[in-house]
Amino acid sequence: MVIKVVGGIIKKENRYLIGRRGPKEKMAGFWEFPGGKLEENESKKECIKRELKEELDIVVVVGELISEYQYSYSDISYHLYFYRIDDFIGEPIPIVHDRLIWAKSNDFKKYNFLPGDNPLIDLMLNNKV
């Protein structure tokens, strides 16, 4: 079974919003781009709007799909979709994360990201997205 997950790439002043998974979350302590699982009968853009409202309490304008790939862990596979967030209303607050930061892409290697985010990070660091 493959689980579909949609993530949002939120950029402000050359920094990207990343969150550290809270202690009650699966894979707690790992950093990630905010997002979540696609629900039945939901479009990918509807999903990222819902997830960012639930996780960060912001309303977003969803831009283009910037990356899509499949990533498998030993016990589960994910199909990941990452959308650029063109604009947002509100100030992001950590609801499911225990910490949010605005990080420069050249600092990404300092953070312990979810392994599934690493293909996207590699693209970002090589200016491919």
What are these regions (language model features)?
Residues 10-11, 18, 87, 102:
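Conserved hydrophobic "DFG−1" position in protein kinase catalytic cores
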Residues 84, 93-124:
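NUDIX/MutT-family hydrolases
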Residues 59, 69-91, 101:
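Active-site-adjacent beta-strand/loop module that shapes the phosphate/pyrophosphate-binding cleft
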Residues 1-16, 37:
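Conserved N-terminal beta-strand and adjoining loop/helix that marks the start
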Residues 55-62:
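Short secondary-structure junctions
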Residues 15-54:
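Conserved Nudix-box catalytic region and its N-terminal flanking loop in Nudix hydrolases
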